[in-house]
Amino acid sequence: MRKRDIFLLLGAVFAITAMVFVQFTTESIETAAWGLSFRQENTAPIGPANPEELARFNAAYLGNTNEKVIYLTFDAGYENGCTEKILDILKKHDAPAAFFLVGNYIEKNADLVRRMVDEGHIVGNHTMHHTDMSALDSKEAFAKELTDLEELYRSITGQEMAKYYRPPKGVYSKDNLRYAKELGYHTVFWSLAYVDWNNDSQPTPETAFSKLIPRIHNGAVVLLHCTSQTNAEIMDELLTRWESMGYRFERIDKLFN
């Protein structure tokens, strides 16, 4: 086979491979539940959609992996007495965070929400009813879940809600990502979390540290639940240990700059 023919053949193979890869990365986020695959300690995990594809929709799960930065985020659908302690510890460490809240939380905990805002944290949109957003059949239904929460937040704080959205339970579709972008939102996933949400079966501090210390990594977007008794108990030591590893904390608005 002549050299010219070999190059033509290789070019065709490359083109087909590229087409298959693009099709895979696009289809991989048609509908999905967010999950992570960790390869080695203190290294960023692999998500179900790659960062470049997510960036097309103003979405991200990971920051700059060349910088020792952590983005703290908390999800909450209700309050059980842990958030005030967590806020105290964040203030002690001068650590900004984002709190993704649902309607029920904002309605019943106006003072805590206002404290989050007053102390420089971001309050993000976790939808009005914590519904499966991928199951909604229209952009209008999707938008209503976000705008209803925006209106509630405005009535409590007198401010506009920051345009950061986290899908309930990490379940999403490509349509959801597109709708969020069209509504001016950034979709925020995560690159580190652990099973801290079950109040009937809280992990021990030792279990929590065994997940959160070896898996921390540059540019980590950390998801924790501020309903967790364990998180409230370990937060001071956790932030101290991460700081001793050379990490600093930044707000998620820096994630998209």
Where are these regions (language model features)?
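N-terminal pre-catalytic segment of deacetylase/amide-hydrolase enzymes
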Residues: 1-73, 79-92, 207, 238-241, ...
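Metal-dependent polysaccharide deacetylase catalytic core of the NodB/CE4 family, i.e.
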Residues: 68-70, 80-82, 91-206, 210-223, ...
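Short amphipathic alpha-helical segments
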Residues: 85-86, 177-179, 235-236
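Catalytic grooves of carbohydrate-active enzymes
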Residues: 217-253
